[in-house]
Amino acid sequence: MKFLDEAKVYIRSGDGGGGSVSFRREKFIEFGGPDGGDGGRGGDVWVETVNGLNTLIDFRFQQHFKATIGTHGMGRNRTGANGSDVTLKVPVGTQIFEEDRETLICDLTVEGQRYCLAHGGNGGFGNAHFKTSTNQAPDWANPGLPGEEKTLWLRLKLIADAGLVGMPNAGKSTFLASVTRARPKIANYPFTTLHPNLGVATIDEREFILADIPGLIEGAHEGVGIGDRFLGHVERTRVLLHLVSAQEEKVGKAYKTVKHELEAYGNELTDKPEIVALSQIDVLDEAELKKKTKELAKACGKTPFQISAVTGKGMTEVLRALRDIIVEENAEEKPAKVPKQRHRDIVVADEGEDVGEDGADDQP
């Protein structure tokens, strides 16, 4: 399945049905009076997170979503049927923005979370509502209120426990493929990875999710290379695994380049716990390995792990280090709860009238 992390959609909730103008007509009842029913409420447009999705590709083929209108009221005080709701199914981690792409509407981080993006219009009052002591036979009714129409942007930030960062050809995809069942594209040229990949790693019977993003080069925050547009996918991670290829001529400079790009991107990425590893060490002899390990340690201020996805050396130790930090971070954070948003009570008002949720002002 192709990966898409941003999509534009057009939504419209349903219009409310019009109220009915009707009078009771029965044999031997001379003055039956008005009995026009209210119109039905228009359908809402909802967004809901579901399990099993990690892309917004479906919204490339369908961008328009429209709920149905409420039906008109009928005689004998019959209320029209409500319109059917429309629900957009999105992956966990999806954010919804206004058309300006900056105003955040909601951030959906829990499976099963729902949010109403557009409320349907209220149905109009039937003429039975307008009967008074001085007007026993009103011959008018309220039209239904129009629904809401919006243009929105959907932006996906993948939910993962650990994020892999580094320069192109640092061995991130090879690492992911060796410790998970993910099968990212692997080749010996820069920018083989063009979109994020996810995989589930297991160590000592504990599972956690790894996210591999395309490599960063100098100037990525200014759009050089693929740029930093995929860094949003590691914003939610607990820890970053920074891989530096042992094939780099200057491993210290390679580390600092990526670190600078993370700082330029912002969003507290550099505040996350970081594990540094010298990867692809199987290509070095002992003397060269010792030299580059010392150089990298000086640049990052800590002793880096030495790993090789080909031989398996150091892989278990790195996974355990990742697991320990993830467990510690999860223990400090309270479990997330699904925010609840209840349906509005059905209220009907004249156009332009302010109506509260409790329907206290629903009289015309």
UniProtKB/Swiss-Prot annotation:
One GO cellular component term noted in the UniProt record for this chain: cytoplasm
- Give all residue intervals belonging to the OBG-type G domain: 160-327
Answer whether the UniProt record assigns the keyword Ribonucleoprotein to this protein. Answer: no
GO process terms (BP):
ribosome biogenesis
* Entry cofactors: Mg(2+)
Which CDD domains does the UniProt record give?
Obg
Family indicated by similarity = Belongs to the TRAFAC class OBG-HflX-like GTPase superfamily. OBG GTPase family.
Function comment = An essential GTPase which binds GTP, GDP and possibly (p)ppGpp with moderate affinity, with high nucleotide exchange rates and a fairly low GTP hydrolysis rate. Plays a role in control of the cell cycle, stress response, ribosome biogenesis and in those bacteria that undergo differentiation, in morphogenesis control.
Q: Which PANTHER family match?
A: DEVELOPMENTALLY REGULATED GTP-BINDING PROTEIN-RELATED, MITOCHONDRIAL RIBOSOME-ASSOCIATED GTPASE 2
Designated name of the protein: GTPase Obg
